[in-house]
Amino acid sequence: MLERFIQTSRYFNIQTVVRVCGDNPFIAPEEIDRLIYFFKKNPCDYACNHQDKLNSGYADGFGAEIIPSSVLYKIETLTQDKRHREHVTTYILENPKKYRLMSVPAPEGLHYPNLCFDINTTDDKKLLETLIEIGVTINSNAFEIVNLYLSQFHEPKNKN
């Protein structure tokens, strides 16, 4: 994956990459906008709001990661470890002393770090189906999804 990001960045002369995880069906554009705004105001080597990385407080599954292409180019020269090359940001997160890492603090109403909206298992798929049955749509924002979840289940489930 790292190589794909680098090739694409070079081909299109991209300065900054916003990475959304494919197992997140409830991507929230407003939370990605919040991340981009945060990144512009707080220049760093990596920022995120897609899960509770770096103690952001976010539920897993709404946001993204953002990283300058120049950092990806540097990582390419620093590691040949298969894991680092398969998972685009693993090297950065495992080497926090080398990079300026930041996270967007979750706003009130989204501060549920134990909630997980990823789809990785059959149980995750069942949860997705239940949320759709109770009213979540492609147009639902992150606040609506969390509120519908809490109204149905009354307490956050623990992450796996």
Segments (PLM) and residue ranges:
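Conserved core of the sugar-phosphate nucleotidyltransferase
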Residues: 3-4, 27-115, 126, 130, ...
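Short beta-strand-to-loop acidic/aromatic patch adjacent to the donor-nucleotide binding site
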Residues: 9, 14-22
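Cytochrome P450 catalytic domain signature, combining two hallmark sequence patches
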Residues: 82, 135-140
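Short, conserved phosphate/pyrophosphate- and ester-handling motifs at nucleotide-, phospho-/glycolipid
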Residues: 121
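Short, acidic Gly/Pro/Ser/Thr-rich loop/turn segments
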Residues: 125-126, 135
